[in-house]
Amino acid sequence: MNVSRPSGRQADALRPVRIERAFTCHAEGSVLVSFGNTLVVCTASVEAKVPVFLRNKGEGWITAEYGMLPRSTHTRSEREAARGKQAGRTLEIQRLIGRALRTCVDRTALGERTITLDCDVLQADGGTRTAAITGAYVALVDAVRCLEQRGQLKKSPLIGAVAAVSVGIYRGMPVLDLDYPEDSDCDTDMNVVMNDEGGFIELQGTAEQQAFRRGELDMLLALAERGTAMLFDIQREALAR
């Protein structure tokens, strides 16, 4: 597949992806994940409590918060804390991250604990939510390993891996892992969350300029499968170091 992309990448190529573990010293799990120029810090914090609706049920909870630094984009944005209200986009993304990560955890095996994934965007160049999910999974694994090292778990609650990638139709061609110039000028934009068994966890797709057809959707999903397979390899390599 050949298409002229601003980055010069092939249509089925990811941006350079790096996952640096133990990026901060306080959280049970922390990573700096980069998808090209998109940089996200993901930390996993463990608390010995659960939300009210789960009390005394013997289950844990996985949740997430997401935010962007004021100058993570081309122009400065006011902090949401200063406005006193989270934007709808922020709420949507942090709920997505939480939903995605809950699918890879046996919450009964976790016990009555909450693991919160805080995903903070240092620099945005497209794909911040997919980078956040991919990095947050690694931070979650490190948090679980920390609990195991403390002797606080009878067995690992992890039941699979999760990663996410964007795909889209840019200049008439399906492409993988859109950066900002592509994302802002594409015909179709889609975020795909998958597990390492080939299952789809969430699909978020929108026709930005013109409708897409079933055949194009199939090509986008095939690209997403290829991309997440590469991301699972990167996650495994990071966790083996």
From Swiss-Prot:
Homohexameric ring arranged as a trimer of dimers. Its EC number is 2.7.7.56. Phosphorolytic 3'-5' exoribonuclease that plays an important role in tRNA 3'-end maturation. Removes nucleotide residues following the 3'-CCA terminus of tRNAs; can also add nucleotides to the ends of RNA molecules by using nucleoside diphosphates as substrates, but this may not be physiologically important. Probably plays a role in initiation of 16S rRNA degradation (leading to ribosome degradation) during starvation. Belongs to the RNase PH family. The keyword ATP-binding does not apply. CDD domains: RNase_PH_bact. The keyword Transferase applies. It holds the Pfam family RNase_PH. This is Ribonuclease PH. Phosphate binds at R89, G127, T128, R129. GO terms for molecular function: 3'-5'-RNA exonuclease activity; tRNA binding; tRNA nucleotidyltransferase activity. It comes from Xylella fastidiosa (strain Temecula1 / ATCC 700964). It catalyses: tRNA(n+1) + phosphate = tRNA(n) + a ribonucleoside 5'-diphosphate. The gene is rph. One of its GO terms (biological process) is tRNA processing. Keywords: Nucleotidyltransferase, RNA-binding, rRNA processing, Transferase, tRNA processing, tRNA-binding. It is an enzyme of class 2 (transferase). It comes from the Bacteria. PROSITE patterns: RIBONUCLEASE_PH (PS01277).
